[in-house]
Amino acid sequence: MGMFIQKEHKPTMAEEEHVDFEGGEAGASLTFPMQCSALRKNGHVVIKGRPCKIVDMSTSKTGKHGHAKVHIVALDIFNGRKYEDMSPSTHNMDVPVVKRDEYQLVNIDDGYLNLMTTDGTTKDDVRLPEGELGNEIEEGFEEGKDLIITVVSAMGEEIALACRDAPSA
C-alpha cells in the first residue's frame, strides 16, 4: 500500500475571490478614525460612545513641550444631550458613519412608522418620535397628507429627524 500526501492548494492571486467592500451594510464599520485636528464644526464625532454633531471647537496651545489640545462641544444626534471632550490635536477620534434617508410615510402602527423607499421597499422599525415632530407627523397623517420622513442612522440606532409634505406629482 502506498501512502499519498496531499499538498494544500494555495490560491494564486488570480484565483482569489474578489470581495466587494463598497456594497451593502453587512460588516460595514460603524465608525472610522480621524485626527482631532481634522475634525470640523457641524461634523460628527463619537464622545463617550455616543454619535454627536460638533457644535463648537477650540484649540489651545499648551506649554513648551506639550501638544496643542482640541476642545470639542457636541450634541448627541439622537437625544440632544451635550458632551464635551478635550484631546491632543494629534490623537485620533472615532467619527460615526451617519446616513440620512428619506421615506414616504405609509402608516403609523402601535407607535412605529411604516415607511416606504422610492423603490417600494418597506421599513417598519422606526419609532414615532415624541414631542412636536411626533405630533406633526400624526396630525399630517390623519389629515391624509403625503409625508416624507427623514431618518438618520448611526452606530446601530435610527431616529425620524424631520418630516415634510411630499412634492405633488
UniProtKB/Swiss-Prot annotation:
One of its GO terms (cellular component) is cytosol. InterPro entries: IF5A-like, IF5A-like_N, NA-bd_OB-fold, Rib_uL2_dom2, Trans_elong_IF5A_hypusine_site, Transl_elong_IF5A_C, Translation_prot_SH3-like_sf. It comes from Schizosaccharomyces pombe (strain 972 / ATCC 24843). Pfam families: eIF-5a, IF5A-like_N. It is found in: Cytoplasm; Nucleus. One of its GO terms (molecular function) is translation termination factor activity. GO terms for biological process: cytoplasmic translational elongation; cytoplasmic translational termination; positive regulation of translational elongation; positive regulation of translational termination; translational elongation. Coiled coil: none annotated. The modification Hypusine is found at K64. This is Eukaryotic translation initiation factor 5A-2. The keyword Plastid does not apply. There are two genes for eIF-5A in S.pombe. SMART domains: eIF-5a. Disulfide bonds: none annotated. Belongs to the eIF-5A family. Keywords: Cytoplasm, Elongation factor, Hypusine, Nucleus, Protein biosynthesis, RNA-binding. CDD domains: S1_eIF5A (cd04468).
